[in-house]
Amino acid sequence: MLSLIDRLAAERRLTLEEYEALVAGQSGEAARYAAALADRTRRAVYGVDVYIRGLIEVGNVCRNDCLYCGIRRSNASCDRYALDEETILACCAEGYELGFRTFVLQGGEGATPVGRVCRVVSRIRAAYPDCAITLSLGEYPADDYRRMYEAGANRYLLRHETADRAHYEKLHPHEMSFENRMRCLRDLKAIGFQTGCGFMVGSPCQTARTLAKDLKFIEAFQPDMCGVGPFIPHHATPFRDFPAGSAGQTLYLLSLIRLIRPNILLPATTALGSVSPDGRERALRAGANVIMPNLSPCAERSKYSLYDNKLATGRESAQNLALLREAVAAVGYRVVTARGDVKNP
């Protein structure tokens, strides 16, 4: 197993069967070895810098009915909200004062017409020309993505969720299309966005083979960012009784992704911190180099509930940057306030 990890670190690619063997053969020794190589790899590209992004959860209205998600359309108990433009701008103003130079606007799909997205992006771009603007608002036609890019957005996060069509269809309702999700990712990259994909670890019906396909997809697609976190069930979804994904497997996969794509921007996700008290710090040691503290209005944060028991210790809040800096420094890294664009390999 260690020889496969060595070859991945050297060549940045494996066969699908070799990826499957790596996933299925995970052990404590393999995970520690992969993490050490991943940490060395990220230090060679990014040093000990950890980039922070100010996350603004702009609304939890969603047209989709994904079987794993707490803000799915069918959840009648979800307390819906949508931030107005002035509130979003106020969040950015607070974030800028705190030192953030990237804002991430994330929300349910289909709730924000492209014209409104472009208007908000244009206003943020005019107010903060030195900042990066990341959007994570789901699937749109290519022309809409182009308008967002021309309005001033730099990055777009759209998790592919799984690179296996049959698995995708088990996680999503029939009106959602695996082909369309992949089309969106290709469009985003072609338009010029720094493009991010991602997936859950431990989702229902996931296998070593489907995870191997995720790794092979990342190898082929070469994303600039990749969001990976454990599946965590939400009580108001069809997957409420499934077990959560494992922190250990998530960390191992983060390390493998860093070896596949040395210059990738790899978040230590809130979901990982939610299943393991020191999950985000462990993620940094396993190859992650991005953290996204929450800039959303405090009154709305609990409403953006994608999964149960979302981390709420304080360190995930943008207002507690001092705590975050201390936690990151304690494991040997440094929070920086740069835009943190992807570096050329």
Please place each PLM-identified region on the residue numbering.
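Short, small-residue-enriched loops and turns at beta-alpha junctions
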Residues: 59-60, 109-113, 174, 202-207, ...
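Catalytic cores of alpha/beta
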Residues: 141-148, 204-218, 274-285
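Canonical Radical SAM [4Fe-4S] cluster-binding loop centered on the CxxxCxxC motif
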Residues: 46-87
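Core AdoMet radical
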Residues: 73-89, 95-116, 120-185, 194-201, ...
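Auxiliary Fe-S-binding modules of radical SAM enzymes
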Residues: 1-29, 96, 219-345
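Alpha-helix-loop-beta-strand connector modules within alpha/beta enzyme cores
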Residues: 113-137, 177-194, 242-264, 316-328
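Glycine-rich, proline-tolerant flexible connector loops at the mouths of alpha/beta enzymes
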Residues: 53-56, 76, 104-115, 166, ...
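Conserved, mostly hydrophobic/aromatic
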Residues: 11, 38, 66, 158, ...
